[in-house]
UniProtKB/Swiss-Prot annotation:
Residues 2-116 form the Response regulatory domain. PANTHER family: REGULATOR OF RPOS. GO terms for cellular component: cytosol; protein-DNA complex. It comes from Streptococcus agalactiae serotype V (strain ATCC BAA-611 / 2603 V/R). Residues 124-222 bind DNA. This is Transcriptional regulatory protein DltR. Member of the two-component regulatory system DltS/DltR. Regulates the expression of the dlt operon. Phosphorylated by DltS.
């Protein structure tokens, strides 16, 4: 499991890194808000420990930008006892928890276990790329602002794209997975359902799109 610690006091950051590494976590460090935001937006982290008082950009500003980008990475604020107002603000902006410095190692580890466990349960029924989630229980495509229901064929097709994101998938493979073994008559249907999905992605203002590779197949890509 990969964690990020965003803390400007290097000695504290390195102590947390050593504690977590000893428990088997992979831990990266950032020492200011700008770097922390850049790291978080990669989407590589299972959880972030984020200090509120940071150089260049505050922890509250980092959190706001992360949630605006549609990322739901669990974030635990590291706060001082005097920062009650910031704690409330942070929770209102979408922080998952906070822990007051100085803190006990066991308390920090317990909070990390709780938040990553809850996040894993949420992710179990979701596939995600960019700012779009596919809910495999409700068969809905979701963005931060809205959601759309998919038909059975649309869902099966989108699930293949999400599970094979950024890979070109041959047309015959898509047809086999969605319609089963069939003849060439299904190719027109495939194009129709691709068109339906593209319209729904545009409605959601998605930053991902279905790309056609002429004569071969399709891929689901993030917009550049």
């Amino acid at each position: 499991m990969r964690l990020l610690v965003v803390e400007d006091e290097k000695s504290i950051a390195e102590a947390i890194q050593a504690l977590l590494a000893d428990k088997g976590y992979s831990v990266d460090l950032a020492f200011d808000g700008d770097d922390g935001l850049e790291y978080i937006l990669t989407g590589l982290y299972d959880l972030v420990l984020l200090d509120i008082m940071l150089p260049k950009r505050s922890g509250l500003s980092v959190l706001k930008r992360v949630r605006e980008a549609g990322l739901e990475t669990p974030i635990i604020f590291l706060t001082a006892k005097s920062q009650t107002y910031d704690k409330v603000n942070g929770l209102d902006l979408g922080a998952d928890d906070y822990i007051t410095k100085p803190f006990e190692a066991d308390e920090l580890l317990a909070r990390i276990r709780l938040r990553t466990r809850q996040s894993s349960l949420i992710r179990a029924n979701q596939l995600r790329l960019g700012n779009i989630r596919l809910n495999t229980d409700s068969h809905e495509l979701e963005s931060k602002e809205s959601s759309v229901k998919l038909s059975n064929k649309e869902f099966l097709l989108m699930e293949v794209f999400m599970r094979n994101a950024k890979q070109i998938i041959p047309k015959n493979q898509l047809i086999s997975k969605v319609w089963g073994p069939s003849d060439n008559s299904e190719y027109n249907q495939l194009e129709v359902f691709i068109s339906f999905l593209r319209k729904k992605l545009r409605f959601l203002k998605a930053d991902i799109e279905i790309i056609t590779t002429k004569g071969f197949g399709y891929s689901l890509e993030e917009r550049t």
